[in-house]
Structures are given as C-alpha cells and as structure tokens.
C-alpha cells in the first residue's frame, strides 16, 4: 500500500489506469514473477493490487525514482523509531537508496528488501485509515487518580502522509483485496 499511495499521491497512476502486465518481468537483469501462474494480462492498477502482483507493482512502481522510493519509505517511518512509550523498540532496517543493489531497488516496491517492525507496518495503514494523517502511537489514553478523576492525555497533531483523496483511494484498494482478492 505504501507504493500505491506514493504513486497515486504523485499523480503517476490511478486505480483505473490500465497496464499490460507480463507473466514475468525482467528489468536491469532482474526477473520478477508472481506467486501464481498467469499469462500476459491487461490489468487496472486496482487489479494489480487486488491480486498482489509483484510484476505489476514493479512495472508501475518504476515510475518512482530510487530516491523517491526511499523517501516515501522514510516518510512513512520505515527504519525509524515510532516514538511509542515503550522501551526496547526496534528501529527496523533500510539501506540508503544509493546502496541498493539491482534487485533491492525493485523489491522495496512490494515490501521486501527492508526490515520493518509490526508497529511500523500498522502505522502505514493507520495513516491511510486516518484520512492520510499518521498519528504518533501511544499506550496511555488517560490517567485516573485515586479519587477517580480522569486526566485525558492530549492527542498530538499528526503528520500528513498523503491527501484525503489518496487515502480514500487506498482504503478502497485494500477493501477490494479483502473482499475479492488474495486476502479473502
């Protein structure tokens, strides 16, 4: 979804944009295929996401430069501490885009080639679910004194990742995957 949101936000694709997706895709000597066998197909971007097609994701995702891919990963918090109020949080791993090899520059488009924590992953989806705004994770919503007085903690302002329109498009893409695609 990170790649989809970046592409849609930058105006490089829409859910209804149509692509000719090959059975296998070879770019820069790197060959990509999908988890299921298929011939060449005409697919909308929504259809590519619907069936989690690595070939289609790389085909469309290469519209983003390597640096743009890296910047979107970092913007969403991959390889960064989330700021949650717990000790022992891991940062995750993302190599600088200038150090990506011939394969990693493409696998990052479909979620491989980086190491992110489950919380970092949840934060990506949380931002899309919050109309494009990523909120800082927190454990404590309120503190209740011994006398029963509740002290609500203020919610910190979030950071805009994508527009409300892009977030809504991504939510629709995800709903389609769950209702009709490979996540059912």
Each predicted region: which residue ranges?
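Beta-lactam-recognizing serine transpeptidase/beta-lactamase-like catalytic domain environment
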Residues: 2-184
């Amino acid at each position: 979804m990170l790649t989809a949101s970046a592409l849609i936000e930058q105006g490089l694709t829409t859910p209804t944009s149509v692509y000719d997706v090959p059975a296998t895709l070879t770019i820069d000597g790197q060959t990509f295929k999908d988890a299921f066998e298929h011939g060449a197909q005409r697919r909308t971007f929504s259809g590519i996401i619907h069936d989690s097609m690595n070939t289609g994701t790389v085909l469309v995702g290469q519209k983003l430069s390597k640096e743009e891919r890296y910047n979107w990963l970092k913007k969403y918090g991959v390889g960064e501490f989330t700021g949650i109020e717990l000790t022992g949080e891991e940062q995750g791993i993302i190599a600088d885009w200038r150090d990506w090899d011939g394969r990693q520059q493409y696998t990052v488009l479909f979620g491989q080639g980086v190491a992110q924590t489950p919380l970092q992953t949840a934060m990506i989806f949380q931002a899309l679910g919050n109309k494009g705004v990523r909120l800082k994770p927190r454990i404590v919503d309120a503190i209740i004194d011994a006398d029963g007085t509740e002290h609500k903690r203020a919610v910190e302002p979030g950071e805009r990742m994508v527009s409300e329109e892009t977030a809504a498009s991504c939510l629709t893409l995800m709903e389609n995957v769950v209702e009709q695609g490979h996540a059912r």
